[in-house]
Swiss-Prot record:
Its main location: cytoplasm. Pfam families: Pkinase (PF00069). It is found in: Cytoplasm; Cytoplasm, Cytoskeleton. InterPro entries: Kinase-like_dom_sf, Prot_kinase_dom, Tribbles/Ser_Thr_kinase_40. The lineage of its organism: Eukaryota, Metazoa, Chordata, Craniata, Vertebrata. Residues 25-50 are annotated as: Disordered. Residues 61-308 form the Protein kinase domain. GO terms for molecular function: protein kinase inhibitor activity; RNA polymerase II-specific DNA-binding transcription factor binding; ubiquitin protein ligase binding; ubiquitin-protein transferase regulator activity. This is Tribbles homolog 2. Interacts with MAPK kinases and regulates activation of MAP kinases. Does not display kinase activity. Residues 29-45 have a biased composition (Polar residues). Belongs to the protein kinase superfamily. CAMK Ser/Thr protein kinase family. Tribbles subfamily.
Length: 343
Protein backbone atom coordinates (compact mmCIF):
# COMPACT_ATOMS: atom_id res chain seq x y z
CA UNK A 1 0.00 0.00 0.00
CA UNK A 2 1.39 3.42 -0.97
CA UNK A 3 0.49 6.45 1.13
CA UNK A 4 2.02 9.67 -0.10
CA UNK A 5 1.66 13.19 -1.34
CA UNK A 6 2.48 13.44 -5.00
CA UNK A 7 4.20 16.40 -6.65
CA UNK A 8 2.08 19.51 -7.32
CA UNK A 9 -0.50 18.90 -10.02
CA UNK A 10 -3.00 20.92 -11.99
CA UNK A 11 -6.53 19.59 -11.75
CA UNK A 12 -8.52 19.73 -14.97
CA UNK A 13 -12.21 18.98 -15.34
CA UNK A 14 -14.08 18.04 -18.46
CA UNK A 15 -17.74 17.84 -19.31
CA UNK A 16 -19.03 14.31 -19.62
CA UNK A 17 -19.18 12.81 -23.09
CA UNK A 18 -22.49 11.73 -24.55
CA UNK A 19 -21.04 8.24 -24.64
CA UNK A 20 -20.77 6.47 -21.32
CA UNK A 21 -17.14 5.53 -21.96
CA UNK A 22 -14.37 7.55 -23.52
CA UNK A 23 -11.08 6.58 -25.06
CA UNK A 24 -8.19 7.52 -22.79
CA UNK A 25 -6.21 9.08 -25.65
CA UNK A 26 -9.23 11.27 -26.32
CA UNK A 27 -9.29 12.40 -22.71
CA UNK A 28 -5.58 13.14 -22.89
CA UNK A 29 -5.99 15.27 -26.00
CA UNK A 30 -8.87 17.15 -24.42
CA UNK A 31 -6.72 17.89 -21.39
CA UNK A 32 -3.89 19.30 -23.50
CA UNK A 33 -6.28 21.34 -25.64
CA UNK A 34 -8.14 23.01 -22.79
CA UNK A 35 -6.58 25.67 -20.54
CA UNK A 36 -5.54 24.24 -17.22
CA UNK A 37 -7.29 25.32 -14.07
CA UNK A 38 -5.61 25.22 -10.69
CA UNK A 39 -8.02 24.84 -7.79
CA UNK A 40 -5.43 25.68 -5.16
CA UNK A 41 -2.39 27.49 -6.58
CA UNK A 42 0.94 27.92 -4.83
CA UNK A 43 0.57 24.80 -2.68
CA UNK A 44 3.47 22.44 -2.21
CA UNK A 45 1.28 19.32 -2.26
CA UNK A 46 -1.35 17.99 -4.67
CA UNK A 47 -4.46 20.07 -4.92
CA UNK A 48 -7.37 17.81 -5.86
CA UNK A 49 -10.80 19.41 -5.96
CA UNK A 50 -12.48 19.58 -2.57
CA UNK A 51 -14.93 16.92 -3.77
CA UNK A 52 -15.09 15.60 -7.34
CA UNK A 53 -17.87 17.37 -9.17
CA UNK A 54 -21.24 15.69 -8.73
CA UNK A 55 -22.37 16.46 -12.30
CA UNK A 56 -20.50 13.40 -13.59
CA UNK A 57 -17.50 15.28 -14.96
CA UNK A 58 -13.99 13.84 -15.04
CA UNK A 59 -11.41 14.89 -12.44
CA UNK A 60 -7.68 14.23 -12.59
CA UNK A 61 -6.23 13.16 -9.24
CA UNK A 62 -2.50 12.56 -9.53
CA UNK A 63 -2.09 9.67 -11.98
CA UNK A 64 -5.79 8.76 -11.88
CA UNK A 65 -8.97 9.90 -13.57
CA UNK A 66 -12.03 10.03 -11.33
CA UNK A 67 -15.12 9.28 -13.39
CA UNK A 68 -18.77 8.92 -12.42
CA UNK A 69 -19.84 8.43 -8.79
CA UNK A 70 -20.71 4.87 -7.79
CA UNK A 71 -22.19 5.60 -4.38
CA UNK A 72 -23.27 8.97 -3.05
CA UNK A 73 -20.67 11.69 -3.35
CA UNK A 74 -17.69 9.83 -1.91
CA UNK A 75 -17.18 6.67 -4.01
CA UNK A 76 -16.07 6.98 -7.63
CA UNK A 77 -15.02 4.84 -10.54
CA UNK A 78 -11.38 5.60 -11.31
CA UNK A 79 -8.91 4.76 -14.07
CA UNK A 80 -5.11 4.72 -13.93
CA UNK A 81 -3.90 7.17 -16.57
CA UNK A 82 -0.97 5.06 -17.78
CA UNK A 83 -2.11 1.45 -17.48
CA UNK A 84 -5.84 1.95 -18.06
CA UNK A 85 -6.58 -0.19 -14.99
CA UNK A 86 -10.03 0.44 -13.53
CA UNK A 87 -10.29 0.99 -9.78
CA UNK A 88 -12.62 2.35 -7.13
CA UNK A 89 -11.76 5.56 -5.26
CA UNK A 90 -13.23 6.50 -1.89
CA UNK A 91 -12.90 10.12 -0.78
CA UNK A 92 -12.47 10.94 2.93
CA UNK A 93 -11.94 14.13 4.87
CA UNK A 94 -8.21 14.36 5.54
CA UNK A 95 -8.90 14.89 9.25
CA UNK A 96 -10.71 11.57 9.71
CA UNK A 97 -9.44 9.16 7.05
CA UNK A 98 -6.98 7.46 9.42
CA UNK A 99 -9.74 6.79 11.95
CA UNK A 100 -12.07 5.49 9.24
CA UNK A 101 -9.40 3.17 7.84
CA UNK A 102 -7.89 2.12 11.19
CA UNK A 103 -9.31 -1.44 10.94
CA UNK A 104 -7.58 -1.84 7.55
CA UNK A 105 -4.25 -0.76 8.99
CA UNK A 106 -4.35 -3.15 11.95
CA UNK A 107 -5.31 -6.29 9.97
CA UNK A 108 -2.98 -8.40 7.86
CA UNK A 109 -3.83 -8.97 4.20
CA UNK A 110 -6.31 -11.69 3.24
CA UNK A 111 -7.42 -12.82 -0.21
CA UNK A 112 -11.10 -12.39 0.67
CA UNK A 113 -10.81 -8.86 2.09
CA UNK A 114 -10.61 -5.81 -0.16
CA UNK A 115 -7.13 -4.28 -0.05
CA UNK A 116 -6.12 -0.64 -0.37
CA UNK A 117 -3.79 -0.19 -3.35
CA UNK A 118 -2.85 3.45 -2.84
CA UNK A 119 -3.72 6.57 -0.86
CA UNK A 120 -3.25 10.10 -2.20
CA UNK A 121 -3.37 12.94 0.30
CA UNK A 122 -4.52 16.41 -0.71
CA UNK A 123 -4.90 19.45 1.50
CA UNK A 124 -8.39 18.58 2.73
CA UNK A 125 -9.22 15.18 1.20
CA UNK A 126 -7.74 11.70 1.20
CA UNK A 127 -8.24 9.62 -1.95
CA UNK A 128 -8.17 5.90 -1.20
CA UNK A 129 -7.95 3.49 -4.14
CA UNK A 130 -9.16 -0.12 -4.23
CA UNK A 131 -9.30 -2.75 -6.95
CA UNK A 132 -12.55 -2.73 -8.91
CA UNK A 133 -15.34 -5.23 -8.28
CA UNK A 134 -17.92 -7.04 -10.41
CA UNK A 135 -21.14 -6.67 -8.46
CA UNK A 136 -22.23 -7.68 -4.96
CA UNK A 137 -23.62 -10.87 -3.43
CA UNK A 138 -27.03 -9.42 -2.60
CA UNK A 139 -27.71 -8.47 -6.22
CA UNK A 140 -26.32 -11.81 -7.38
CA UNK A 141 -28.70 -13.80 -5.16
CA UNK A 142 -31.64 -11.62 -6.27
CA UNK A 143 -30.79 -12.36 -9.89
CA UNK A 144 -30.31 -16.10 -9.36
CA UNK A 145 -33.31 -16.40 -6.99
CA UNK A 146 -31.18 -18.83 -4.97
CA UNK A 147 -27.91 -20.71 -5.39
CA UNK A 148 -27.16 -24.38 -5.86
CA UNK A 149 -25.41 -25.87 -2.85
CA UNK A 150 -22.12 -26.40 -4.64
CA UNK A 151 -21.94 -22.75 -5.68
CA UNK A 152 -23.18 -21.51 -2.31
CA UNK A 153 -20.59 -23.62 -0.47
CA UNK A 154 -17.75 -22.24 -2.59
CA UNK A 155 -18.81 -18.62 -2.06
CA UNK A 156 -19.87 -18.92 1.58
CA UNK A 157 -16.55 -20.53 2.52
CA UNK A 158 -14.78 -17.42 1.23
CA UNK A 159 -17.20 -15.19 3.14
CA UNK A 160 -16.67 -17.11 6.38
CA UNK A 161 -12.90 -17.09 5.80
CA UNK A 162 -12.90 -13.30 5.65
CA UNK A 163 -14.94 -13.04 8.85
CA UNK A 164 -12.75 -15.59 10.67
CA UNK A 165 -9.64 -13.64 9.67
CA UNK A 166 -11.16 -10.45 11.07
CA UNK A 167 -12.15 -12.15 14.32
CA UNK A 168 -8.67 -13.66 14.70
CA UNK A 169 -7.21 -10.20 14.08
CA UNK A 170 -9.31 -8.55 16.79
CA UNK A 171 -12.07 -7.02 14.66
CA UNK A 172 -15.84 -7.31 15.00
CA UNK A 173 -17.62 -6.41 11.76
CA UNK A 174 -21.04 -5.45 13.25
CA UNK A 175 -22.90 -4.76 9.99
CA UNK A 176 -22.50 -8.02 8.07
CA UNK A 177 -24.82 -8.61 5.12
CA UNK A 178 -24.67 -10.00 1.61
CA UNK A 179 -24.25 -6.56 0.06
CA UNK A 180 -20.95 -6.11 1.92
CA UNK A 181 -19.37 -8.88 -0.16
CA UNK A 182 -18.35 -8.12 -3.74
CA UNK A 183 -17.00 -10.21 -6.59
CA UNK A 184 -13.33 -10.14 -7.58
CA UNK A 185 -13.89 -11.60 -11.04
CA UNK A 186 -16.39 -11.40 -13.88
CA UNK A 187 -17.14 -15.13 -13.55
CA UNK A 188 -18.55 -14.49 -10.03
CA UNK A 189 -16.44 -17.24 -8.45
CA UNK A 190 -14.33 -15.22 -5.98
CA UNK A 191 -15.64 -12.81 -3.36
CA UNK A 192 -14.14 -10.35 -0.91
CA UNK A 193 -15.37 -8.21 1.96
CA UNK A 194 -15.87 -4.75 0.45
CA UNK A 195 -14.68 -2.65 3.40
CA UNK A 196 -13.83 -2.62 7.09
CA UNK A 197 -15.10 0.88 7.76
CA UNK A 198 -17.88 -0.32 10.10
CA UNK A 199 -15.60 -2.71 11.99
CA UNK A 200 -14.86 -2.30 15.69
CA UNK A 201 -11.31 -2.81 16.95
CA UNK A 202 -11.27 -4.94 20.09
CA UNK A 203 -9.00 -4.13 23.01
CA UNK A 204 -7.86 -7.53 24.19
CA UNK A 205 -9.91 -10.73 24.21
CA UNK A 206 -13.20 -9.21 25.37
CA UNK A 207 -15.55 -8.84 22.39
CA UNK A 208 -18.42 -7.27 24.34
CA UNK A 209 -20.31 -4.53 22.51
CA UNK A 210 -23.34 -2.47 23.48
CA UNK A 211 -24.29 -0.55 20.32
CA UNK A 212 -27.29 -1.36 18.11
CA UNK A 213 -25.47 -1.17 14.80
CA UNK A 214 -26.56 -3.25 11.81
CA UNK A 215 -29.25 -4.13 9.28
CA UNK A 216 -32.64 -5.27 10.68
CA UNK A 217 -32.86 -8.49 8.64
CA UNK A 218 -29.42 -9.62 9.86
CA UNK A 219 -29.55 -8.52 13.51
CA UNK A 220 -29.21 -11.20 16.20
CA UNK A 221 -31.77 -11.86 18.97
CA UNK A 222 -29.47 -10.81 21.81
CA UNK A 223 -29.02 -7.34 20.31
CA UNK A 224 -32.80 -6.92 20.36
CA UNK A 225 -33.26 -8.49 23.78
CA UNK A 226 -30.63 -6.72 25.85
CA UNK A 227 -29.95 -3.18 26.91
CA UNK A 228 -26.50 -4.22 28.04
CA UNK A 229 -23.58 -5.83 26.25
CA UNK A 230 -23.42 -8.79 23.90
CA UNK A 231 -20.73 -10.82 22.10
CA UNK A 232 -19.79 -8.99 18.92
CA UNK A 233 -18.28 -12.09 17.32
CA UNK A 234 -21.35 -14.21 18.07
CA UNK A 235 -23.56 -11.50 16.55
CA UNK A 236 -21.39 -11.56 13.42
CA UNK A 237 -21.84 -15.33 13.23
CA UNK A 238 -25.63 -14.95 13.41
CA UNK A 239 -25.43 -12.58 10.44
CA UNK A 240 -23.40 -15.23 8.60
CA UNK A 241 -26.25 -17.66 9.22
CA UNK A 242 -28.76 -15.24 7.73
CA UNK A 243 -26.51 -14.85 4.70
CA UNK A 244 -26.14 -18.61 4.20
CA UNK A 245 -29.87 -19.23 4.55
CA UNK A 246 -30.63 -16.46 2.04
CA UNK A 247 -28.13 -17.81 -0.47
CA UNK A 248 -29.62 -21.31 -0.33
CA UNK A 249 -33.33 -20.51 0.06
CA UNK A 250 -33.71 -17.21 -1.80
CA UNK A 251 -35.28 -15.30 1.09
CA UNK A 252 -34.39 -14.19 4.59
CA UNK A 253 -35.07 -16.67 7.42
CA UNK A 254 -36.94 -13.87 9.22
CA UNK A 255 -38.86 -11.34 7.16
CA UNK A 256 -41.76 -8.95 7.62
CA UNK A 257 -42.57 -5.50 6.26
CA UNK A 258 -43.25 -4.24 9.80
CA UNK A 259 -40.05 -3.83 11.88
CA UNK A 260 -41.81 -4.75 15.14
CA UNK A 261 -43.11 -8.01 13.65
CA UNK A 262 -39.71 -8.75 12.12
CA UNK A 263 -37.97 -8.24 15.47
CA UNK A 264 -40.51 -10.51 17.22
CA UNK A 265 -39.71 -13.30 14.76
CA UNK A 266 -35.97 -12.83 15.26
CA UNK A 267 -36.36 -12.87 19.06
CA UNK A 268 -38.21 -16.19 18.86
CA UNK A 269 -35.52 -17.57 16.56
CA UNK A 270 -37.91 -19.91 14.76
CA UNK A 271 -37.51 -20.48 11.03
CA UNK A 272 -38.24 -23.17 8.45
CA UNK A 273 -35.64 -24.89 6.29
CA UNK A 274 -36.85 -26.34 2.97
CA UNK A 275 -36.60 -30.10 2.64
CA UNK A 276 -34.80 -29.63 -0.67
CA UNK A 277 -31.59 -28.74 1.18
CA UNK A 278 -29.11 -31.47 2.04
CA UNK A 279 -28.79 -32.72 5.64
CA UNK A 280 -25.33 -31.16 5.99
CA UNK A 281 -26.57 -27.77 4.78
CA UNK A 282 -29.47 -27.91 7.24
CA UNK A 283 -27.07 -28.88 10.01
CA UNK A 284 -24.78 -25.92 9.31
CA UNK A 285 -27.66 -23.43 9.21
CA UNK A 286 -29.07 -24.74 12.50
CA UNK A 287 -25.62 -24.68 14.09
CA UNK A 288 -25.26 -20.99 13.27
CA UNK A 289 -28.78 -19.61 13.76
CA UNK A 290 -29.13 -20.54 17.42
CA UNK A 291 -30.84 -18.11 19.80
CA UNK A 292 -28.25 -18.66 22.50
CA UNK A 293 -24.99 -16.98 21.36
CA UNK A 294 -22.76 -19.41 23.26
CA UNK A 295 -24.28 -22.35 21.36
CA UNK A 296 -23.38 -21.01 17.92
CA UNK A 297 -20.36 -22.16 15.99
CA UNK A 298 -17.49 -19.70 15.89
CA UNK A 299 -16.43 -18.29 12.54
CA UNK A 300 -13.42 -20.62 12.57
CA UNK A 301 -15.56 -23.66 13.42
CA UNK A 302 -17.82 -22.86 10.48
CA UNK A 303 -14.86 -23.42 8.15
CA UNK A 304 -14.38 -26.92 9.56
CA UNK A 305 -17.97 -28.01 8.92
CA UNK A 306 -18.28 -31.17 6.74
CA UNK A 307 -20.72 -29.43 4.37
CA UNK A 308 -17.76 -27.77 2.63
CA UNK A 309 -16.08 -31.11 1.90
CA UNK A 310 -19.19 -32.65 0.32
CA UNK A 311 -18.84 -34.12 -3.16
CA UNK A 312 -21.89 -32.34 -4.54
CA UNK A 313 -21.66 -33.97 -7.97
CA UNK A 314 -22.13 -37.41 -6.41
CA UNK A 315 -24.04 -37.20 -3.16
CA UNK A 316 -26.10 -34.02 -3.48
CA UNK A 317 -27.06 -33.89 -7.14
CA UNK A 318 -30.72 -33.60 -6.21
CA UNK A 319 -30.36 -30.89 -3.58
CA UNK A 320 -30.47 -27.14 -4.10
CA UNK A 321 -32.09 -27.27 -7.55
CA UNK A 322 -33.25 -23.90 -8.83
CA UNK A 323 -36.99 -24.39 -8.69
CA UNK A 324 -39.36 -21.53 -9.41
CA UNK A 325 -39.93 -19.54 -6.24
CA UNK A 326 -41.15 -16.14 -5.10
CA UNK A 327 -38.38 -13.56 -4.98
CA UNK A 328 -38.26 -12.47 -1.37
CA UNK A 329 -34.78 -10.97 -1.14
CA UNK A 330 -35.61 -7.25 -1.04
CA UNK A 331 -34.11 -4.47 -3.07
CA UNK A 332 -31.57 -2.09 -1.54
CA UNK A 333 -34.17 0.40 -0.32
CA UNK A 334 -35.46 -2.19 2.17
CA UNK A 335 -32.04 -2.72 3.74
CA UNK A 336 -32.23 0.05 6.30
CA UNK A 337 -29.84 0.51 9.17
CA UNK A 338 -30.91 -0.67 12.60
CA UNK A 339 -29.98 2.56 14.39
CA UNK A 340 -33.22 4.55 13.78
CA UNK A 341 -35.34 1.89 15.48
CA UNK A 342 -33.51 2.41 18.79
CA UNK A 343 -33.10 6.20 18.81
Amino acid sequence: MNIHRSTPITIARYGRSRNKTQDFEELSSIRSAEPSQSFSPNLGSPSPPETPNLSHCVSCIGKYLLLEPLEGDHVFRAVHLHSGEELVCKVFEISCYQESLAPCFCLSAHSNINQITEILLGETKAYVFFERSYGDMHSFVRTCKKLREEEAARLFYQIASAVAHCHDGGLVLRDLKLRKFIFKDEERTRVKLESLEDAYILRGDDDSLSDKHGCPAYVSPEILNTSGSYSGKAADVWSLGVMLYTMLVGRYPFHDIEPSSLFSKIRRGQFNIPETLSPKAKCLIRSILRREPSERLTSQEILDHPWFSTDFSVSNSGFGAKEACDQLVPDVNMEENLDPFFN
